[in-house]
Protein backbone atom coordinates (compact mmCIF):
# COMPACT_ATOMS: atom_id res chain seq x y z
CA UNK A 1 0.00 0.00 0.00
CA UNK A 2 1.21 3.52 -0.78
CA UNK A 3 -1.00 6.29 0.64
CA UNK A 4 1.44 9.16 0.33
CA UNK A 5 -1.18 11.37 -1.32
CA UNK A 6 -3.68 10.72 1.46
CA UNK A 7 -1.78 12.64 4.14
CA UNK A 8 -1.26 16.44 4.29
CA UNK A 9 2.53 16.26 4.62
CA UNK A 10 5.19 15.81 1.96
CA UNK A 11 7.19 12.63 1.79
CA UNK A 12 10.48 14.30 2.71
CA UNK A 13 9.00 16.06 5.72
CA UNK A 14 7.32 12.85 6.88
CA UNK A 15 10.69 11.06 6.80
CA UNK A 16 12.41 13.95 8.59
CA UNK A 17 9.71 14.24 11.26
CA UNK A 18 9.68 10.48 11.79
CA UNK A 19 13.45 10.54 12.22
CA UNK A 20 13.25 13.46 14.64
CA UNK A 21 10.72 11.63 16.81
CA UNK A 22 12.86 8.49 16.79
CA UNK A 23 15.92 10.61 17.58
CA UNK A 24 14.49 11.51 20.97
CA UNK A 25 15.27 7.91 21.91
CA UNK A 26 18.90 8.06 20.76
CA UNK A 27 19.90 11.47 22.08
CA UNK A 28 19.00 10.41 25.62
CA UNK A 29 21.70 7.73 25.34
CA UNK A 30 24.39 9.15 23.09
CA UNK A 31 24.61 12.62 24.61
CA UNK A 32 25.14 11.02 28.03
CA UNK A 33 28.17 8.90 27.09
CA UNK A 34 30.88 11.51 27.85
CA UNK A 35 29.17 12.29 31.17
CA UNK A 36 29.40 8.83 32.75
CA UNK A 37 32.54 9.62 34.81
CA UNK A 38 31.11 12.97 35.94
CA UNK A 39 27.80 11.39 36.99
CA UNK A 40 29.49 8.50 38.78
CA UNK A 41 31.71 10.95 40.65
CA UNK A 42 29.02 13.50 41.48
CA UNK A 43 26.55 10.90 42.79
CA UNK A 44 29.28 8.94 44.63
CA UNK A 45 28.85 5.62 42.81
CA UNK A 46 31.38 3.10 44.13
CA UNK A 47 31.89 0.89 41.06
CA UNK A 48 32.66 2.75 37.79
CA UNK A 49 31.12 -0.14 35.82
CA UNK A 50 27.77 0.82 37.35
CA UNK A 51 27.75 3.89 35.13
CA UNK A 52 26.50 1.53 32.41
CA UNK A 53 23.27 1.20 34.41
CA UNK A 54 22.35 4.69 33.20
CA UNK A 55 21.93 3.11 29.78
CA UNK A 56 20.48 -0.17 31.08
CA UNK A 57 17.72 1.50 33.14
CA UNK A 58 16.75 3.65 30.19
CA UNK A 59 16.69 0.67 27.83
CA UNK A 60 14.58 -1.33 30.29
CA UNK A 61 11.98 1.44 30.28
CA UNK A 62 12.24 1.75 26.51
CA UNK A 63 11.56 -1.95 26.05
CA UNK A 64 8.69 -2.29 28.49
CA UNK A 65 6.99 0.92 27.39
CA UNK A 66 6.64 -0.04 23.76
CA UNK A 67 3.96 -2.62 24.43
CA UNK A 68 1.79 -0.09 26.26
CA UNK A 69 2.11 2.68 23.67
CA UNK A 70 1.52 0.30 20.77
CA UNK A 71 -1.73 -1.06 22.19
CA UNK A 72 -2.95 2.45 22.96
CA UNK A 73 -2.05 3.66 19.46
CA UNK A 74 -4.16 0.89 17.90
CA UNK A 75 -7.12 2.12 19.95
CA UNK A 76 -6.78 5.91 20.04
CA UNK A 77 -4.67 6.57 16.94
CA UNK A 78 -0.99 7.28 16.39
CA UNK A 79 -0.94 11.06 16.75
CA UNK A 80 -2.28 11.51 20.34
CA UNK A 81 -0.05 8.73 21.66
CA UNK A 82 3.11 10.20 20.12
CA UNK A 83 2.29 13.68 21.43
CA UNK A 84 1.52 12.39 24.92
CA UNK A 85 4.66 10.28 25.05
CA UNK A 86 6.94 13.12 23.98
CA UNK A 87 5.37 15.40 26.62
CA UNK A 88 6.14 12.82 29.33
CA UNK A 89 9.66 12.53 27.91
CA UNK A 90 10.24 16.25 28.46
CA UNK A 91 9.15 15.99 32.09
CA UNK A 92 11.30 12.92 32.77
CA UNK A 93 14.39 14.49 31.18
CA UNK A 94 14.08 17.60 33.33
CA UNK A 95 13.57 15.57 36.52
CA UNK A 96 16.64 13.44 35.69
CA UNK A 97 18.64 16.64 35.61
CA UNK A 98 17.48 17.54 39.13
CA UNK A 99 18.01 14.21 40.92
CA UNK A 100 20.31 14.07 43.95
CA UNK A 101 21.03 10.32 44.16
CA UNK A 102 22.08 7.61 41.74
CA UNK A 103 19.08 5.47 42.69
CA UNK A 104 16.67 8.30 41.92
CA UNK A 105 18.44 8.94 38.63
CA UNK A 106 18.05 5.30 37.61
CA UNK A 107 14.36 5.33 38.54
CA UNK A 108 13.72 8.41 36.44
CA UNK A 109 15.86 7.08 33.62
CA UNK A 110 13.45 4.13 33.52
CA UNK A 111 10.56 6.62 33.21
CA UNK A 112 12.57 8.51 30.61
CA UNK A 113 12.88 5.33 28.56
CA UNK A 114 9.22 4.50 29.13
CA UNK A 115 8.26 7.85 27.61
CA UNK A 116 10.78 7.57 24.78
CA UNK A 117 9.18 4.26 23.81
CA UNK A 118 6.22 6.19 22.38
CA UNK A 119 8.43 7.10 19.40
CA UNK A 120 8.31 3.44 18.36
CA UNK A 121 4.78 4.18 17.14
CA UNK A 122 6.58 5.76 14.17
CA UNK A 123 7.19 2.25 12.82
CA UNK A 124 3.45 1.63 12.98
CA UNK A 125 2.84 4.88 11.10
CA UNK A 126 5.22 3.79 8.36
CA UNK A 127 3.49 0.40 8.18
CA UNK A 128 0.12 2.18 7.96
CA UNK A 129 1.28 3.87 4.76
CA UNK A 130 3.74 1.48 3.12
CA UNK A 131 4.53 -2.21 2.72
CA UNK A 132 7.25 -4.48 1.41
CA UNK A 133 10.34 -2.95 -0.15
CA UNK A 134 8.81 0.54 -0.06
CA UNK A 135 8.47 0.22 3.69
CA UNK A 136 12.09 -0.90 3.94
CA UNK A 137 13.15 2.12 1.88
CA UNK A 138 11.23 4.56 4.09
CA UNK A 139 12.63 2.99 7.27
CA UNK A 140 16.15 3.16 5.82
CA UNK A 141 15.79 6.84 4.91
CA UNK A 142 14.42 7.52 8.38
CA UNK A 143 17.38 5.66 9.84
CA UNK A 144 19.83 7.79 7.81
CA UNK A 145 18.46 11.01 9.33
CA UNK A 146 18.10 9.37 12.74
CA UNK A 147 21.82 8.46 12.71
CA UNK A 148 22.77 12.13 12.70
CA UNK A 149 22.06 11.97 16.44
CA UNK A 150 24.80 9.49 17.43
CA UNK A 151 27.14 11.40 15.11
CA UNK A 152 26.51 14.72 16.84
CA UNK A 153 25.15 13.92 20.31
CA UNK A 154 28.38 12.78 22.04
CA UNK A 155 30.13 15.95 20.88
CA UNK A 156 27.17 17.98 22.13
CA UNK A 157 27.37 16.22 25.47
CA UNK A 158 31.12 16.86 25.66
CA UNK A 159 30.63 20.54 24.82
CA UNK A 160 28.00 20.89 27.55
CA UNK A 161 30.41 19.29 30.04
CA UNK A 162 33.08 21.81 29.09
CA UNK A 163 30.64 24.66 29.70
CA UNK A 164 28.83 23.39 32.79
CA UNK A 165 27.32 20.48 34.68
CA UNK A 166 26.27 17.07 33.35
CA UNK A 167 22.77 18.01 34.48
CA UNK A 168 22.47 20.41 31.56
CA UNK A 169 22.68 17.45 29.18
CA UNK A 170 19.31 16.23 30.45
CA UNK A 171 17.92 19.73 30.07
CA UNK A 172 19.19 19.81 26.47
CA UNK A 173 17.36 16.51 25.82
CA UNK A 174 14.18 18.07 27.18
CA UNK A 175 14.58 21.16 24.99
CA UNK A 176 15.16 19.03 21.89
CA UNK A 177 12.06 16.94 22.63
CA UNK A 178 10.02 20.12 23.15
CA UNK A 179 10.96 21.31 19.66
CA UNK A 180 10.02 17.93 18.19
CA UNK A 181 6.70 18.03 20.06
CA UNK A 182 5.85 21.43 18.55
CA UNK A 183 6.72 20.19 15.05
CA UNK A 184 4.63 17.05 15.49
CA UNK A 185 1.72 19.01 16.96
CA UNK A 186 1.65 21.30 13.94
CA UNK A 187 2.36 18.83 11.13
CA UNK A 188 1.92 15.20 12.15
CA UNK A 189 -1.15 13.60 10.52
CA UNK A 190 -3.14 10.66 11.81
CA UNK A 191 -2.14 7.63 9.74
CA UNK A 192 -4.37 4.95 11.27
CA UNK A 193 -7.55 4.44 9.28
CA UNK A 194 -10.66 4.56 11.51
CA UNK A 195 -11.76 1.07 10.43
CA UNK A 196 -8.47 -0.38 11.71
CA UNK A 197 -8.84 0.95 15.25
CA UNK A 198 -9.03 -1.82 17.81
CA UNK A 199 -10.81 -2.00 21.13
CA UNK A 200 -9.01 -2.39 24.43
CA UNK A 201 -10.73 -5.74 24.90
CA UNK A 202 -8.07 -8.03 26.46
CA UNK A 203 -9.27 -10.96 24.36
CA UNK A 204 -8.80 -8.98 21.16
CA UNK A 205 -5.37 -7.76 22.27
CA UNK A 206 -4.37 -11.31 23.12
CA UNK A 207 -5.47 -12.55 19.70
CA UNK A 208 -3.52 -9.79 17.96
CA UNK A 209 -0.43 -10.54 20.04
CA UNK A 210 -0.86 -14.24 19.32
CA UNK A 211 -0.91 -13.46 15.60
CA UNK A 212 2.46 -11.72 15.95
CA UNK A 213 4.09 -14.32 18.20
CA UNK A 214 2.98 -17.33 16.16
CA UNK A 215 4.04 -15.88 12.82
CA UNK A 216 7.35 -17.56 12.01
CA UNK A 217 8.79 -14.74 9.89
CA UNK A 218 7.74 -12.00 12.30
CA UNK A 219 8.94 -13.71 15.47
CA UNK A 220 12.29 -15.09 14.33
CA UNK A 221 13.33 -11.87 12.62
CA UNK A 222 12.36 -10.02 15.80
CA UNK A 223 14.61 -12.35 17.79
CA UNK A 224 17.44 -11.84 15.29
CA UNK A 225 17.08 -8.08 15.77
CA UNK A 226 17.10 -8.60 19.52
CA UNK A 227 20.51 -10.21 19.80
CA UNK A 228 22.06 -7.77 17.34
CA UNK A 229 20.64 -4.85 19.34
CA UNK A 230 22.18 -6.47 22.40
CA UNK A 231 25.63 -6.17 20.83
CA UNK A 232 24.93 -2.51 20.02
CA UNK A 233 23.83 -1.76 23.60
CA UNK A 234 26.98 -3.44 24.91
CA UNK A 235 29.09 -1.26 22.61
CA UNK A 236 27.30 1.93 23.67
CA UNK A 237 27.62 1.05 27.35
CA UNK A 238 31.32 0.13 27.12
CA UNK A 239 32.68 2.62 24.59
CA UNK A 240 33.53 5.35 27.10
CA UNK A 241 35.43 2.90 29.32
CA UNK A 242 37.23 1.42 26.31
CA UNK A 243 38.62 4.77 25.20
CA UNK A 244 39.43 5.80 28.77
CA UNK A 245 40.80 2.57 30.25
CA UNK A 246 42.10 0.65 27.21
CA UNK A 247 43.38 3.36 24.89
CA UNK A 248 43.75 6.16 27.48
CA UNK A 249 42.22 8.66 25.05
CA UNK A 250 38.84 9.60 26.56
CA UNK A 251 38.84 12.99 24.85
CA UNK A 252 38.55 11.54 21.34
CA UNK A 253 35.69 9.18 22.18
CA UNK A 254 32.94 11.47 20.78
CA UNK A 255 34.72 11.80 17.44
CA UNK A 256 35.41 8.09 17.10
CA UNK A 257 31.86 7.26 18.15
CA UNK A 258 30.62 9.65 15.47
CA UNK A 259 32.84 7.97 12.88
CA UNK A 260 31.32 4.56 13.63
CA UNK A 261 27.82 6.02 13.53
CA UNK A 262 28.67 7.62 10.20
CA UNK A 263 29.38 4.19 8.75
CA UNK A 264 25.94 3.10 9.97
CA UNK A 265 24.42 6.10 8.20
CA UNK A 266 26.19 5.36 4.92
CA UNK A 267 25.02 1.75 5.13
CA UNK A 268 21.43 2.80 5.81
CA UNK A 269 21.47 5.23 2.88
CA UNK A 270 22.94 2.56 0.62
CA UNK A 271 20.19 0.19 1.72
CA UNK A 272 17.52 2.77 0.90
CA UNK A 273 18.89 3.02 -2.66
CA UNK A 274 19.31 -0.69 -3.28
CA UNK A 275 16.58 -2.48 -1.34
CA UNK A 276 13.79 -2.05 -3.90
CA UNK A 277 16.06 -3.51 -6.60
CA UNK A 278 17.93 -6.23 -4.71
CA UNK A 279 15.42 -7.12 -2.00
CA UNK A 280 15.61 -7.24 1.78
CA UNK A 281 16.76 -10.83 2.02
CA UNK A 282 19.77 -10.60 -0.28
CA UNK A 283 21.04 -7.49 1.51
CA UNK A 284 20.35 -8.52 5.11
CA UNK A 285 21.47 -12.13 4.78
CA UNK A 286 24.74 -11.04 3.19
CA UNK A 287 25.19 -8.42 5.91
CA UNK A 288 24.74 -10.82 8.83
CA UNK A 289 27.35 -13.18 7.36
CA UNK A 290 29.83 -10.31 7.01
CA UNK A 291 28.95 -9.14 10.55
CA UNK A 292 29.97 -12.55 11.87
CA UNK A 293 33.20 -12.60 9.86
CA UNK A 294 34.26 -9.13 11.06
CA UNK A 295 33.39 -9.95 14.68
CA UNK A 296 35.43 -13.16 14.48
CA UNK A 297 38.42 -11.24 13.09
CA UNK A 298 38.05 -8.60 15.81
CA UNK A 299 37.86 -11.23 18.55
CA UNK A 300 41.01 -12.92 17.23
CA UNK A 301 42.93 -9.63 17.12
CA UNK A 302 41.84 -8.76 20.67
CA UNK A 303 42.67 -12.24 21.99
CA UNK A 304 46.17 -12.12 20.47
CA UNK A 305 46.85 -8.72 22.04
CA UNK A 306 47.15 -6.97 18.70
CA UNK A 307 44.35 -4.48 19.37
CA UNK A 308 45.14 -0.84 18.64
CA UNK A 309 42.85 2.15 18.77
CA UNK A 310 42.57 2.27 14.99
CA UNK A 311 41.95 -1.45 14.58
CA UNK A 312 39.16 -1.09 17.11
CA UNK A 313 37.61 1.93 15.38
CA UNK A 314 37.81 0.52 11.86
CA UNK A 315 36.55 -2.94 12.78
CA UNK A 316 33.79 -1.51 14.95
CA UNK A 317 32.76 0.86 12.16
CA UNK A 318 32.55 -2.06 9.74
CA UNK A 319 30.56 -4.03 12.30
CA UNK A 320 28.14 -1.14 12.73
CA UNK A 321 27.67 -0.83 8.96
CA UNK A 322 26.70 -4.49 8.64
CA UNK A 323 24.52 -4.13 11.75
CA UNK A 324 22.64 -1.32 9.99
CA UNK A 325 22.13 -3.33 6.80
CA UNK A 326 20.89 -6.30 8.81
CA UNK A 327 18.61 -4.68 11.36
CA UNK A 328 16.82 -2.19 9.09
CA UNK A 329 15.72 -5.04 6.82
CA UNK A 330 15.05 -7.50 9.64
CA UNK A 331 12.67 -4.92 11.12
CA UNK A 332 10.82 -4.42 7.85
CA UNK A 333 10.50 -8.18 7.28
CA UNK A 334 9.27 -8.68 10.84
CA UNK A 335 6.54 -6.07 10.28
CA UNK A 336 5.49 -7.25 6.82
CA UNK A 337 3.19 -10.15 7.88
CA UNK A 338 1.44 -8.26 10.70
CA UNK A 339 0.17 -5.13 8.96
CA UNK A 340 -3.40 -5.74 10.16
CA UNK A 341 -2.24 -5.23 13.76
CA UNK A 342 0.68 -2.88 13.06
CA UNK A 343 0.49 -1.05 16.40
CA UNK A 344 0.53 -4.16 18.56
CA UNK A 345 2.97 -5.78 16.13
CA UNK A 346 5.52 -2.96 16.29
CA UNK A 347 5.15 -2.56 20.04
CA UNK A 348 5.46 -6.27 20.81
CA UNK A 349 8.46 -6.61 18.53
CA UNK A 350 10.00 -3.49 20.05
CA UNK A 351 9.31 -4.68 23.59
CA UNK A 352 11.02 -7.99 22.91
CA UNK A 353 13.94 -6.61 20.90
CA UNK A 354 14.70 -3.67 23.18
CA UNK A 355 13.96 -5.23 26.57
CA UNK A 356 15.80 -8.48 25.93
CA UNK A 357 18.59 -6.60 24.15
CA UNK A 358 19.14 -4.55 27.31
CA UNK A 359 19.73 -7.81 29.18
CA UNK A 360 22.10 -9.09 26.49
CA UNK A 361 23.99 -5.81 26.53
CA UNK A 362 24.24 -5.82 30.32
CA UNK A 363 25.58 -9.40 30.33
CA UNK A 364 28.29 -8.48 27.83
CA UNK A 365 29.05 -5.18 29.55
CA UNK A 366 29.52 -6.64 33.01
CA UNK A 367 32.47 -8.68 31.69
CA UNK A 368 34.50 -5.59 30.80
CA UNK A 369 38.01 -6.30 32.02
CA UNK A 370 40.11 -3.49 30.65
CA UNK A 371 40.26 -4.93 27.13
CA UNK A 372 38.09 -5.01 24.01
CA UNK A 373 37.84 -8.81 24.00
CA UNK A 374 34.48 -9.06 25.86
CA UNK A 375 32.84 -6.73 23.34
CA UNK A 376 34.32 -8.50 20.31
CA UNK A 377 33.44 -12.00 21.50
CA UNK A 378 30.00 -10.83 22.62
CA UNK A 379 29.34 -9.40 19.15
CA UNK A 380 30.47 -12.66 17.56
CA UNK A 381 28.09 -14.72 19.68
CA UNK A 382 25.26 -12.27 18.96
CA UNK A 383 25.90 -12.58 15.23
CA UNK A 384 25.93 -16.37 15.32
CA UNK A 385 22.71 -16.55 17.35
CA UNK A 386 21.05 -14.01 15.02
CA UNK A 387 22.03 -16.14 12.04
CA UNK A 388 20.39 -19.12 13.72
CA UNK A 389 17.14 -17.17 14.08
CA UNK A 390 17.30 -16.07 10.43
CA UNK A 391 17.75 -19.68 9.34
CA UNK A 392 14.74 -20.64 11.47
CA UNK A 393 12.67 -17.88 9.84
CA UNK A 394 13.67 -18.99 6.34
CA UNK A 395 13.41 -22.75 7.02
CA UNK A 396 17.17 -23.19 6.68
CA UNK A 397 17.64 -21.42 3.34
CA UNK A 398 19.22 -17.98 2.94
CA UNK A 399 18.73 -15.58 0.00
CA UNK A 400 15.33 -16.96 -0.98
CA UNK A 401 13.69 -14.83 -3.64
CA UNK A 402 10.33 -13.28 -2.81
CA UNK A 403 8.01 -11.35 -5.06
CA UNK A 404 9.26 -7.83 -5.79
CA UNK A 405 6.96 -6.06 -3.41
CA UNK A 406 7.76 -8.13 -0.39
CA UNK A 407 11.31 -9.30 0.00
Residue ranges and their predicted role:
Residues 45, 77, 98-103, 115, ...:
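Helix-breaking motifs and short loop linkers at transmembrane-helix boundaries and internal kinks
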Residues 104, 132-133, 137-186:
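Helix-loop-helix hairpin linking two adjacent transmembrane segments in secondary transporters
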Residues 63-103:
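Conserved MFS/SLC helix-loop-helix module at the cytosolic interface between two early adjacent transmembrane helices
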Residues 108-146:
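Cytoplasmic helix-loop-helix junction between adjacent transmembrane helices
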Residues 282-329:
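C-terminal transmembrane helical hairpin of 12-TM major facilitator-type secondary transporters
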